[in-house]
Amino acid sequence: MSDQEFGLDAIRNIGIMAHIDAGKTTTTERILFYAGRTHKIGEVHEGGATMDWMEQEQERGITITSAATTVFWLGSKINIIDTPGHVDFTIEVERSLRVLDGAVAVFDAVSGVEPQSETVWRQANKYGVPRVAFVNKMDRMGANYFGAVESMREKLGANAIPVHCPIGAESQFVGMVDLISQKALYFLDDSLGAKWEEREIPEDLQEQCEVLRMQLLEELATVDETNEAFMEKVLEAPESITEEEIHRVMRKGVIEGKINPVLCGSAFKNKGVQQLLDVIVKWLPSPLDRGNVRGMNLKTGEEVCLKPSKDGPLAALAFKIMTDPYVGRITFIRIYSGTLKKGSAILNSTKDKKERISRLLEMHANERTDRDEFTVGDIGACVGLKFSVTGDTLCDENQEIVLERIEAPEPVIDMAIEPKSKGDREKLAQALSALSEEDPTFRVSTNEETGQTIISGMGELHLDILRDRMIREFKVEANVGKPQVSYKETITKASDSETKYVKQSGGRGQYAHVCLEIEPNEPGKGNEVVSKIVGGVIPKEYIPAVIKGVEEGLNSGVLAGYGLVDVKVSIVFGSYHEVDSSEMAFKICGSMAVKEACRKALPVILEPIMKVTVITPEDHLGDVIGDLNRRRGKILGQEASRNMAQVNAEVPLSEMFGYMTSLRSLTSGRATSTMEPAFFAKVPQKIQEEIVKK
């Protein structure tokens, strides 16, 4: 099908999201198969999944990057992004949700809501992404569809509404009752799920299905309270309500974020995936339903509102960078307004840099097809952009707009890295530069005292995979040190400084004079540097140099050399010399001034605190809690179900190295654990002294 056939109302930009191992990628593979995009089903456990195209993904059976593809169903074009479920790759989920219009949340029928399900659900809430839920793995031992629905309500605060009633469970799962059409769907095993039979609802389920359908209708009546005719029918003649009426109200409720309909199935056993495809088209929003896109005009500071129209001015967001050995740098974009043509010149308004598009590519995992243009609602990739990174806005040169950026969390773990030979040094620098462009949560810095290169990321798996990619993709041999905690520094009170940088050694000298005021910024807000210079006491051409110097000064703290965070700096006064002042002098002076001010502002060291979830047999609960307490953990609460207990805690990352090994020995290998970064907190004084000594 050509793209010209699709109006905006027939486009769906959706993500598939879940906890690791809930079956996201398998669900996506079945969608590709049924929609005719692939002619053979790829299996994750065999390393053959189309969407898991990186070697590391196929070996480890997990999704690391967000793969994109397009399928066609019920006369609509569906752009799908399959996202990772592992906490170390949370930025992949964040940047995908930022550009999507809707999402399918996949849950395991046995486990229900798991820790990473909560994380991705929160991320979707943040961007207001409408969702439907798919309870997968109904064929597993212990599968409980209604238990999963209940856990969505309890743990996510979701208004989860069952639209199916399973027929059988575990190995006896043969299909489901569709509560909207009031038909029982039985899947024929010999057709790989492509065919099913519609039958009457089995007698033993009729009463339960009547109750569930009535609950569904009553919930829908609260979605659209202005629709009095629908409410009246629900109260007086529910049997007269048509399927079309239900779909119309359901769609409205989903788009407004008031309800989350829940389907069931088994992607691996080919049951229920086409029904999921149907509701993606019927209930999830098109770009039109998501409304106008808001941004800011950087020159005037005014809010700009653009309609999703292909004839409007261009507004697109770069949400991912990928390096390809043959094509080079590929930038993934979502177009919110206007049309982008191959060969056109555009503006990166975030950086105020002109860019030129050399090629446009439609992606299917790592395969690509050349395109002449992308228009509003499209998700695609372009080649030729030199300056654009994740979160940058691309627009027309004469109509500047900057869209909301994508926030990247602070890394929590560091490793030293060095090339194995001199020949690897340049290749290592290129690899680190390319990988940090691709991934905003991967940072590269230099330890000022030792001169070592330090790489920082979201966890051991994150850095392990990036190291693996350096060897395979960039052919770099490197030695890495042990993982270390990525500490930060901050200040606890306001302070100021007055610094002069004067050098006289014959000929032209160096002169700069800078006065700063600093104060603690809101936790998590990052560093802010502003100029309050008036009257030209520092000429305006030198102000950027002072700001650059201050920013560089904040990169290494005053206690133990860790980067400073959450510091607000105001440049308030200074002076210059007609001959001796230069950009370099003001940059050095800015760096010295901020260090001096920070020393007087009662600096402290911050450590990453992890949100830890442990699921353990109840007879080991006391040992697990005792062990977490010994690790300076704070127990937030515990829940019990089926002889298992779930413990939620906040524990400093420095205490969690080797935790899985110790947990296995404590519980004879019967407990599981997940952890994700929660926030940074001040370290106890005794530990701070030990860190500074090191």
Curated annotation (Swiss-Prot):
Limits of the tr-type G domain: 9-288
Gene that this polypeptide is encoded by: fusA
Species of the source: Chlamydia muridarum (strain MoPn / Nigg)
Any one Pfam family match given in the protein's UniProt record, by short name: EFG_C
Keyword vocabulary terms for this entry: Cytoplasm, Elongation factor, GTP-binding, Nucleotide-binding, Protein biosynthesis
Top-level taxon in the UniProt lineage: Bacteria
Family matches, as SUPFAM superfamilies: EF-G C-terminal domain-like (SSF54980), P-loop containing nucleoside triphosphate hydrolases (SSF52540), Ribosomal protein S5 domain 2-like (SSF54211), Translation proteins (SSF50447)
Main localization, broad class: cytoplasm
InterPro entries: EFG_II (IPR041095), EFG_III (IPR009022), EFG_III/V (IPR035647), EFG_IV (IPR047872), EFG_V (IPR035649), EFG_V-like (IPR000640), EFTu-like_2 (IPR004161), G_TR_CS (IPR031157)
GO terms for MF: GTP binding; GTPase activity; translation elongation factor activity
Function: Catalyzes the GTP-dependent ribosomal translocation step during translation elongation. During this step, the ribosome changes from the pre-translocational (PRE) to the post-translocational (POST) state as the newly formed A-site-bound peptidyl-tRNA and P-site-bound deacylated tRNA move to the P and E sites, respectively. Catalyzes the coordinated movement of the two tRNA molecules, the mRNA and conformational changes in the ribosome.
Keyword GTP-binding attached: yes
Localization per Swiss-Prot or TrEMBL: Cytoplasm
Gene Ontology annotations for the cellular component aspect, listed alphabetically: cytoplasm
Protein name: Elongation factor G
Binding site residues for GTP: 18-25, 82-86, 136-139
Family from the record: Belongs to the TRAFAC class translation factor GTPase superfamily. Classic translation factor GTPase family. EF-G/EF-2 subfamily.
NCBIfam families in UniProt: EF-G, PRK12740.1-5, small_GTP
GO process annotations (BP): ribosome disassembly
